[in-house]
Design a protein with these regions (language model features):
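Short amphipathic alpha-helix segments
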Residues: 23-37
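Auxiliary tRNA-acceptor-end handling modules of aminoacyl-tRNA synthetases
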Residues: 1-18, 30, 39-50, 54-182
Length: 182
């Protein structure tokens, strides 16, 4: 039977979304590995800022340029290792138990209200999290990203579809930065 195969890139919306989710999983895994999961209470992707994500970290860790360089180095190593990103479909109750065990109370609460009996969980080298939507098959595809200190948190930037798969230049939003300090 004949068919057409179309390659999807970060220049397209669906490819860009899969890349964004996958690089976020990679970043989370790197933070937990570098800092030690016992030192992290929570990493939150707060909102979109400067065409990337503004993230915060709560725990016994201070976000510094040096920490971000260590995290980026670990991310680069995992990209080089081309680790699989594995999707598992599991019962919602099991997902709740896993998030409880992994100290993710927000996700534990989220799934306690879920009506569907099954949920998709993604894992990367032993680290599990929930993402809505498709992921890339492995870390080897995640070669383009930037981490930037943006106190009190940090920014992660990634290729954008509206820029034909390029990472946007950083644009400091001074009014917003001032509101973070207040």
């Amino acid at each position: 039977e004949s068919c057409t195969i179309k390659f999807v890139t970060t220049a397209e919306t669906c490819g860009n979304q899969a890349y964004r989710r996958s690089v976020t999983l990679l970043m989370l895994k790197a933070f937990y590995d570098v800092c030690g999961e016992q030192n992290i209470d929570k990493i939150t992707v707060e909102f979109s800022l400067s065409k990337g994500y503004y993230c915060t970290l709560k725990g016994n860790v201070k976000i510094t340029r040096e920490l971000l360089m260590s995290v980026k180095k670990h991310m680069t190593q995992m990209v080089f290792q081309n680790l699989p990103i594995v999707k598992s479909t599991i019962p919602t109750g099991e997902a709740i138990e896993r998030f409880k065990k992994n100290r993710m109370p927000d996700k534990e609460r989220l799934f306690s209200f879920r009506r569907s009996s099954m949920v998709n969980i993604y894992s990367l080298n032993g680290f599990e999290d929930y993402f809505y939507g498709y992921m890339l098959p492995s870390t080897g595809y995640l070669k383009e990203y930037k981490l930037r200190l943006y106190a009190p948190g940090f920014l992660i930037s990634y290729p954008r579809s509206e820029l034909k798969g390029q990472i946007p230049e950083f644009s400091d939003e001074k009014v917003f930065r001032q509101s973070l300090k207040e």
